């Protein structure tokens, strides 16, 4: 029973390198093609990849979405076909039909196995057809679910310009509507900001979240120079040496490394703005690095926690236990948030973790456990699902946050589950989305309580005696 709970002194890290299941990273196409409005995503893989995208995203091919499959066949794998000519034909067709500003090639497991030189092909083809081609190797051999976005943003980060003309400065980063669109003059707008080096935020989140976080920083006089990715490829933010960068998601370590090493940016190590506690710590870390004082953040956080609906949800979670099997790399941030809500985290499974990139989040998790008086959880990287199921059986948690592969089998054994994929697609960042995040977490608990009231307590029907 105590195998998954560490002593109160420090977080306990383990690595099992077992068989774990996550969503395929090529699923990042689902939200990135909508985020970058003038893009076209070409997934280079097999029919299996196509079936996955078609079913996972639920988009009918008749809708002509801005993504497509380049299906590899036997001739491609046996090197009997010319890869360059085939990809050129497809890209010319995309250019003719959709005329995108950028084409993103998504590499898959098959392109890795047959060693396709996508970068070399893209560089040659880009010069021939006149459209930028970004290559991202989002294969399931090397990456977990959300790391697909990480590979795309890391490739796009290298395309960000260092210097832009003065007249372009306002349109870069996709924030001109927030800062300039409603103002008659630039001088009046500049008065509300402190003077500080450029700040770029990286991570793909829905437009309402972009607006919320940008305006939260604006309240403290912090100007956001741009977001990566921007809504349009031509609006990628300028990143010159010395630009400060900060992430909004814990799975973007490769992007952070690229920005620091290739673009000579300065990374702000901060917790991630998930939940009011994380959002407050995120803003404080940015302000501290930029040397800007903040006011009213503690009151803003308390206001969110004291909202009647948030209080009701927290009361429902208080004293309950949660177990993370690991899927989307949001586990550390969600665990910290749920500990603050009064839950006990028994184990945090996570497919991959960069301890340097998540250092501030880990420190906040540790501090939150101490303040709430609960044991610090064991963090298991690359968890072995068989071993995890044995631990779940022994610990009997009130809630298991897991990938879709294990949800129904666990439910059939009387374990309450929540799909981790829902947190990936939901709006969970910032002060304003706390209620939505808690609604997601508590939904299976409220559902089970409602079913229990109806007398429906078992998922599997017992055989009737004859």
UniProtKB/Swiss-Prot annotation:
Required cofactor names: [4Fe-4S] cluster
Keywords: 4Fe-4S, ATP-binding, Chlorophyll biosynthesis, Iron, Iron-sulfur, Metal-binding, Nucleotide-binding, Oxidoreductase, Photosynthesis
InterPro entries according to UniProt: LIPOR_BchN/ChlN, Nase/OxRdtase_comp1, Protochl_reductN
UniProt pathway: Porphyrin-containing compound metabolism; chlorophyll biosynthesis (light-independent)
Gene Ontology BP terms: light-independent chlorophyll biosynthetic process; photosynthesis, dark reaction
Entry EC no(s): 1.3.7.7
Cofactor: how and how many bound: Binds 1 [4Fe-4S] cluster per heterodimer. The cluster is bound at the heterodimer interface by residues from both subunits.
Domain of life from the UniProt record: Bacteria
Pfam family of the protein (one): Oxidored_nitro
Coiled-coil intervals: none
Residue numbers binding [4Fe-4S] cluster: 24, 49, 109
Catalyzed reactions per annotation: chlorophyllide a + oxidized 2[4Fe-4S]-[ferredoxin] + 2 ADP + 2 phosphate = protochlorophyllide a + reduced 2[4Fe-4S]-[ferredoxin] + 2 ATP + 2 H2O
GO MF annotation terms: 4 iron, 4 sulfur cluster binding; ATP binding; metal ion binding; oxidoreductase activity, acting on iron-sulfur proteins as donors; oxidoreductase activity, acting on the CH-CH group of donors, iron-sulfur protein as acceptor
Record function comment: Component of the dark-operative protochlorophyllide reductase (DPOR) that uses Mg-ATP and reduced ferredoxin to reduce ring D of protochlorophyllide (Pchlide) to form chlorophyllide a (Chlide). This reaction is light-independent. The NB-protein (ChlN-ChlB) is the catalytic component of the complex.
Subunit structure: Protochlorophyllide reductase is composed of three subunits; ChlL, ChlN and ChlB. Forms a heterotetramer of two ChlB and two ChlN subunits.
Similarity field: Belongs to the BchN/ChlN family.
HAMAP family reported for this sequence: ChlN_BchN
Protein name: Light-independent protochlorophyllide reductase subunit N
């Amino acid at each position: 029973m105590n195998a998954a709970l560490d002593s109160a002194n420090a977080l306990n890290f383990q690595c099992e390198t077992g068989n774990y299941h996550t969503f395929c990273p090529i699923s990042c196409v689902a939200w990135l093609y909508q985020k970058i409005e003038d893009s076209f995503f070409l997934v280079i893989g097999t029919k299996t990849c196509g079936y996955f995208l078609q079913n996972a995203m639920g988009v009918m091919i008749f809708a002509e979405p801005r993504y497509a499959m380049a299906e590899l066949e036997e001739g491609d794998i046996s090197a009997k076909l010319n890869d360059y000519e085939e990809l050129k034909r497809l890209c010319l067709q995309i250019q003719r039909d959709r005329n995108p500003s950028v084409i993103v090639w998504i590499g898959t497991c098959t392109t890795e196995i047959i060693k396709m030189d996508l970068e070399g092909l893209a560089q040659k083809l880009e010069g021939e057809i006149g459209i930028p081609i970004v290559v991202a190797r989002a294969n399931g051999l090397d990456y977990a679910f959300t790391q697909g976005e990480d590979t795309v943003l890391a490739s796009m980060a290298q395309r960000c310009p260092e210097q832009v003309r003065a007249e372009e400065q306002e349109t870069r980063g996709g924030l001109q509507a927030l800062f300039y669109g409603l103002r008659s003059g630039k001088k009046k707008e500049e008065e509300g900001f402190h003077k500080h080096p450029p700040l770029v935020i990286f991570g793909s989140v829905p437009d309402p979240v972009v607006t919320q976080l940008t305006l939260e920083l604006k309240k403290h006089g912090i100007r956001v120079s741009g977001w990566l990715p921007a809504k349009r490829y031509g609006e990628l933010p300028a990143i010159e040496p010395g630009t400060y960068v900060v992430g909004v998601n814990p799975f973007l370590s490769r992007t952070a490394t690229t920005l620091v090493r290739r673009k000579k940016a300065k990374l702000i190590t901060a917790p991630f703005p998930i939940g009011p506690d994380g959002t407050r710590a995120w803003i404080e870390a940015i302000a501290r690095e930029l040397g800007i004082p903040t006011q009213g953040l503690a009151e803003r956080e308390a206001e969110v926690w004291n909202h009647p609906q948030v209080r009701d949800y927290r009361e429902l979670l208080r004293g309950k236990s949660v177990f993370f099997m690991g899927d989307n790399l949001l586990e550390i941030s969600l665990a910290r948030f749920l500990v603050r809500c009064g839950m006990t985290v028994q184990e945090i499974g996570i497919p991959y973790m960069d301890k340097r990139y998540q250092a501030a989040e880990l420190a906040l998790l540790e501090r939150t456990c101490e303040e709430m008086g609960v044991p610090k959880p064991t963090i298991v990287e690359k968890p072995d699902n068989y071993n995890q199921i044995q631990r779940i059986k022994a610990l009997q948690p009130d809630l298991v946050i897991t990938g879709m592969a294990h949800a129904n089998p666990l439910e059939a054994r009387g374990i309450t589950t929540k799909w981790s994929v829902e947190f990936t697609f939901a709006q969970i960042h910032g002060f304003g989305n706390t209620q939505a995040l808690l609604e997601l977490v508590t939904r299976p608990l409220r559902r089970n309580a409602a079913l229990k009231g109806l007398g429906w307590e078992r998922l599997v029907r017992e055989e009737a005696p004859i």
